[in-house]
Regions:
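Short, conserved phosphate/pyrophosphate- and ester-handling motifs at nucleotide-, phospho-/glycolipid
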Residues: 2-3, 209
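P-loop NTPase nucleotide-binding core
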Residues: 3-108
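Short glycine-/polar-rich loops that comprise or flank the Walker A/P-loop
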Residues: 17-21, 137-139, 164-167
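An amphipathic alpha-helix signature
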Residues: 33-40, 176-184
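Conserved Walker B catalytic segment
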Residues: 79-147, 156
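Short regulatory helix/loop adjacent to the ATP-binding pocket of P-loop NTPases
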Residues: 148-166
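Conserved AAA+ ATPase "SRH/arginine-finger" region at the nucleotide-binding site
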Residues: 167-178
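Amphipathic alpha-helical "lid/sensor" segments that cap RecA-like P-loop NTPase cores
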Residues: 184-226
Length: 226
């Protein structure tokens, strides 16, 4: 689905080489604090393998989290970030965007289930994020969501902060013919057989929803002997 598509694009060599890519899913988030924690954790996890220089740049910007990030005598980072470390979400959010603006490479940030921010306890979260996004020239954002009507209201209603601030893309279901070709090809490569009618049944049963179709086809693949 949309998550797999975004992650797939992030793996393109020209993207991996020239950008920092961050992906967070905020479906379970209930507050700005949850969002800030998810974003902070993702940035740390992405930067750590890159090296101490990249991580140190984030560390210098995010003063409110410095107690959770330490460096040993060899300069290797140690991360111990928990939700409880986000004591002042608004402050940490400001610091994160300061980092994104100053990062040594452009940043791509994907936020999945973005519609969740409409239910946060804090007021004006949409307006706050819109302001930061608007003024962050070193980053581009992908806002994905599964509740199409909520996402539509956020970006198409004139009174909402994100009105006309993005290019909208609706992802339709992958055509049945593509699933047939894809599934039968992989079964055949493994010396297995898959009837096209079975693919049709799975597709119709789950109304073209990618996650369910792939899950069932994968199960059938593992159950089918060569």
């Amino acid at each position: 689905g949309k998550t797999g598509l975004i992650r797939h694009c992030f793996q393109f060599p020209e993207i991996k080489q020239d950008y920092y890519t961050f992906f967070i899913d905020i479906y379970d988030s209930r507050s700005l604090r949850d969002l800030v924690f998810a974003l902070s954790k993702e940035i740390l996890e992405v930067l750590k393998p890159i090296g101490k220089k990249a991580l140190h740049g984030f560390w210098e910007c995010v003063k409110s989290l410095q107690a959770s990030i330490s460096f040993d005598v060899n300069g290797m980072p140690s991360l111990n970030l928990g939700l409880g470390d986000i004591q002042a979400p608004a402050t940490t959010l400001d610091e994160i965007f300061r980092y994104l603006e100053q990062a040594d490479k452009p940043c791509l940030i994907a936020i999945d289930e973005f519609q969740q921010i409409t239910g946060y306890a804090e007021k004006n979260v949409e307006a706050t994020l819109r302001t930061y996004v608007q003024h962050c020239n070193n980053a581009r954002f992908i806002f994905a969501g599964s509740q199409r009507h909520v996402m539509g209201n956020m970006f198409l209603t004139p009174s909402r902060p994100f009105y006309q601030s993005v290019s909208m893309m609706h992802l339709e279901s992958i055509p049945l013919e593509e699933y047939m070709r894809f599934a039968c090809m992989h079964f055949k490569r493994a010396g297995k057989e898959m009837e096209e009618s079975a693919v049709t049944t799975v597709y119709q049963q789950f109304e073209g929803v990618t996650w369910y179709i792939q899950k069932v086809l994968n199960t059938l693949y593992n159950m089918t002997p060569e």
